[in-house]
A protein has these predicted regions:
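Structural signature of nuclease core domains in nucleic-acid processing machines
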Residues: 2-172
């Protein structure tokens, strides 16, 4: 939630114990306010959150002019762009110009005065950064195109995946 981001931003430069205490306090606050189910709150790995606070992804979030979370979009893109983003061969003829509906929810769009950045969280247990790039490159390419269309003339200049399992930001 945005309250968690605020709590983390307030202590991001603090010692690890202070960050962990803030995460635990926010977890308890959300459970008490019934914003999070107690069973889910109990499974929150505070050490993975600490690793996130120390990450490049969190530095980028804190440095943005605006942070758009769970940005839903639906747009039409030329079939040629959709096929190219998937790494497939482009068709010839009118099919390449046909519109394809692209719909999704971007985890985080970072807004800067002259550009945008796209961050996606992944919880799956892939082994290497290359595994994540292979699995999600097409998704992030299409999301970036859709977001650029919505926020023109600003361009998406960075696409990244934050792997909770690996604890790192992976550029796509």
């Amino acid at each position: 939630s945005s309250d968690l981001f605020g709590a983390l931003a307030a202590v991001r430069d603090a010692e690890d114990d202070a960050v962990l205490a803030a995460v635990r306090a926010e977890r308890e606050r959300q459970a008490a306010a019934q914003l999070t189910l107690p069973a889910i709150a109990g499974k929150l790995d505070v050490y993975k959150i600490l690793r996130f606070v120390r990450s490049e992804a969190f530095r980028r979030i804190c440095g943005a002019e605006d942070v758009l979370r769970e940005l839903a979009f639906i747009t039409s893109l030329p079939a040629a762009e959709v096929i190219a983003a998937q790494g497939r061969a482009l068709p010839d003829g009118p099919a390449a110009d046909a519109g394809v509906l692209v719909q999704g929810i971007a985890d985080i769009v970072l807004v800067y005065p002259d550009h945008l950045e796209l961050l996606d969280y992944k919880t799956d247990r892939r082994k290497t950064p290359a595994d994540f790039v292979r699995a999600y490159r097409a998704q992030l390419e299409l999301y970036a195109k859709a977001i650029e269309k919505r926020f023109a003339p600003r361009r998406v200049t960075y696409k990244g995946i934050y792997s909770l399992e690996l604890g790192e930001l992976i550029e796509v």
